[in-house]
Amino acid sequence: PIVRELTTEQESSVYKKMEQIRTGMGAEVSRLKPEDATDICVETVEEGGESDERRERMRRDEVVLVLDYPDRKNCFQDVKIYARAGESVTVWTVVRSKKDAEGKAVLRTLLQAEENAKIRLVQVDLLGDRMQLFNDIGVESGKQAQIEVVQLFLGAEKIWAGSYATLTGEKSHLQLDVGYYREKQQLLDMNYVAQHIGKKTESNMNVGGVLQDASKKVFRGTIDFPLGCVGAKGDEMEDVLILGEDAINQTVPLILCAEDDVEGNHGASIGRPADEVLFYLASRGLSEEDACNLLARAKLEALCNRIGEQKIAEQAENWLWEVTGDET
């Protein structure tokens, strides 16, 4: 793919059109964007007639974006990912700051995949625990397009996350996997929507994580089947491990259905570790705190293994070990 940094005035018609893609946090987020903002635009390129440099860049189907947010500043970043018909691209986005930094980090990511295109987006949050993160995603898919989104929320004091996937093209597919670790009085508030417009479209949303101490998590997951999306299928699964006595978990699943020939499913596994599991780990010499930390790591390391980029995966795993303490 080609990576460009464009001001609003320099954007092509494709990127300007992408501004109309609906996102999970709504139009209010776009109002936070400064007029002189610089967008990061990732696009696949057409074959034929390119320069040697352009052909060489075409061989790269992976892009790593590391966004460092400064202390005591509020920053907005737009990332736009465009995959032409039949092309594929993987983008890793790491948001990070110094441990003691404070401020607001706003990240909006817009994805558009044309017919038979594939986009894989991996987002890893490594912000300091005094930061606030607004993470917004909008997706639009063409016929038989495939979208995969992997998110891992480990840092920041408060996180508001939204995603809205408009599955327009017939047989297009969305795979969304979210993992999180919340401790102390940290907050994670999520609003995720999969709207099935095209026939035989599919969506899978899997959200799972750990709540320690007095942390709070809210998950609103919506699968929308409007009239005409014949044969569409949407699945939504949540898996929450509650380790804190004062932790608060709120789950608000919603399936909207105006079409008869569709299939929508919601499942949830929410609760504390079973006594027999804690007893077994205690028999192996682990205290209850160490046992809970072990379970927390095990839950999220599986998602770390799916990051697919070694350095980023190592950073996420090191962060996870730091917040859960050393294994004994």
Question: Which residues does each PLM region occupy?
Answer:
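Short, Gly/Pro- and small/polar-rich lid/capping loops
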Residues: 1-23
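Conserved beta-strand/loop scaffold segments within soluble protein domains that form the structured core
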Residues: 5, 21-279, 283-286, 307, ...
